[in-house]
Amino acid sequence: QDAFQLGGSSFAQTQNKIGTEVPTIKDADCFKRAFNTIQTLILDNQILAGHDIGSGGLITTLLEMCFADVDLGANIDLTVFEEKDVVKVLFAENIGIVMQAKDDSVFESTLNNNNIPFYKLGTVTTTDNLQLTADNSQPSTVNIQLSTYRDIWFETSYLLDQKQTQHHQATARFE
């Protein structure tokens, strides 16, 4: 429910900036309702997959969700957001969760009944592709080949893991 702010984000850090405006929780009651509603949806087995939007923003969340399997991709429609600056939409670290619903109608009615704002972003595919459609002054589509970025992601994670754990444990997780 907050504007897409890049202050304090990983993206801002890559630009050697800190920023002055950061995302925040504007409505604590809504946050609490969302948390409790998601717990209910989990108990009712209505969530197939989920990931918080945190460090790295929405793009990192989408990539990490797709990295879970080699035949897992998504078609995402970013035009559902009022914000037209695609960089802000993808890299702002606003509080949020991306979830894959078991049954869209049950999921959506549960969120609506609990007054939880949400966006339907797209669909899961069985491809090696994350397709992002945006409207940043004119419609455009970007296709990301997931296998390329998955390899980079896991290699980087492995190198970091080596510094944080015993070498053989990092190697076992990587292989």
Model-derived segments and spans:
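Short, surface-exposed beta-edge/turn micro-motifs
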Residues: 94-96
